[in-house]
């Protein structure tokens, strides 16, 4: 609890542990941690969660549709492609991109769709990607935690996603990574 209050203040959020909103947020974070989220290694996801809970953040884009195709080819090659449709303000963007794997294809397609609106995304790099199985007794139906570390110039941040579907967990962490960078850019302009 004290760590959470400290972090919230570090993010310039006015959190009081006796306030009803703050108590609700603390309960929600504990529930997420029970589901497998781990915010100690993903402070960017925690910061976004707190800003959203206090009504100080709205997503910069809305996912309308995402389709991922992985094709195993005759020559042992594997091709991954993501087709994405997002909405930014009132404008819908529909695009596709390939990648070294399905998560890389999703990352490439998302940035391709958003870079026109948010050029700062050209500088963003995913520098690390880690997957951890949360309950090994469930085999391929086990929930996984995905941690993504991203960089942009001298800045570095980490985000997290959890799901029984590795693509969904990766999507959650990827979206947080993009939104975090865009939030930081917006805060720079406001300050």
Q: Each predicted region: which residue ranges?
A:
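Terminal or standalone catalytic/regulatory effector modules within metabolic enzymes
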Residues: 1-191
């Amino acid at each position: 609890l004290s760590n959470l209050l400290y972090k919230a203040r570090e993010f310039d959020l006015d959190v009081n542990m006796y306030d009803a909103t703050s108590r609700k947020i603390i309960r929600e974070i504990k529930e997420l941690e029970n589901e497998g989220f781990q915010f100690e290694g993903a402070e960017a996801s925690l910061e976004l969660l707190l800003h959203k809970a206090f009504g100080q953040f709205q997503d910069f884009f809305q996912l309308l549709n995402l389709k991922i195709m992985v094709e195993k080819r005759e020559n042992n090659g594997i091709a991954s492609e993501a087709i994405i449709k997002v909405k930014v303000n009132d404008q819908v963007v529909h695009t596709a991109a390939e990648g070294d794997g399905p998560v890389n294809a999703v990352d490439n397609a998302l940035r391709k769709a958003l870079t026109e609106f948010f050029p700062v995304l050209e500088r963003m790099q995913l520098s690390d990607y880690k997957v951890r199985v949360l309950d090994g007794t469930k085999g391929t139906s086990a929930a996984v935690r995905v941690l993504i570390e991203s960089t942009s110039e001298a800045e570095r941040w980490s985000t997290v996603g959890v799901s029984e579907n590795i693509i969904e967990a990766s999507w959650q962490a990827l979206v947080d990574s993009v939104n975090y960078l865009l939030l930081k850019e917006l805060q720079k302009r406001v300050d």
